[in-house]
């Protein structure tokens, strides 16, 4: 249920009954190996999380607890020199502009060329 509440089992049962009467239902989601939250420029990865699902009047809310690790997506993109040269030749831009466009598009050659043309 809700970790760290410091309730004895009787209080917990009473709270669960009260939640049920208000139309709230809370369950553990079992077997979750990983939760990934994708943002524009990074990902938050939670391995072996504890996930609770609360259903209140048809609206589901997920509570995720665990140790999170952040990955910067921009830092992970490795752009080959051949790709940079191709974008430079196709668009006539500088090496820095071609590299920036490729990083912004995640290494997508066609998208980088279209953005610079």
Curated annotation (Swiss-Prot):
Gene3D superfamilies: DNA helicase RuvA subunit, C-terminal domain, Nascent polypeptide-associated complex domain. One of its GO terms (biological process) is protein transport. Coiled coil: none annotated. It comes from the Archaea. GO terms for cellular component: nascent polypeptide-associated complex. Keywords: Protein transport, RNA-binding, Transport. The keyword Protein transport applies. Homodimer. Interacts with the ribosome. Binds ribosomal RNA. This is Nascent polypeptide-associated complex protein. It comes from Methanothermobacter marburgensis (strain ATCC BAA-927 / DSM 2133 / JCM 14651 / NBRC 100331 / OCM 82 / Marburg) (Methanobacterium thermoautotrophicum).
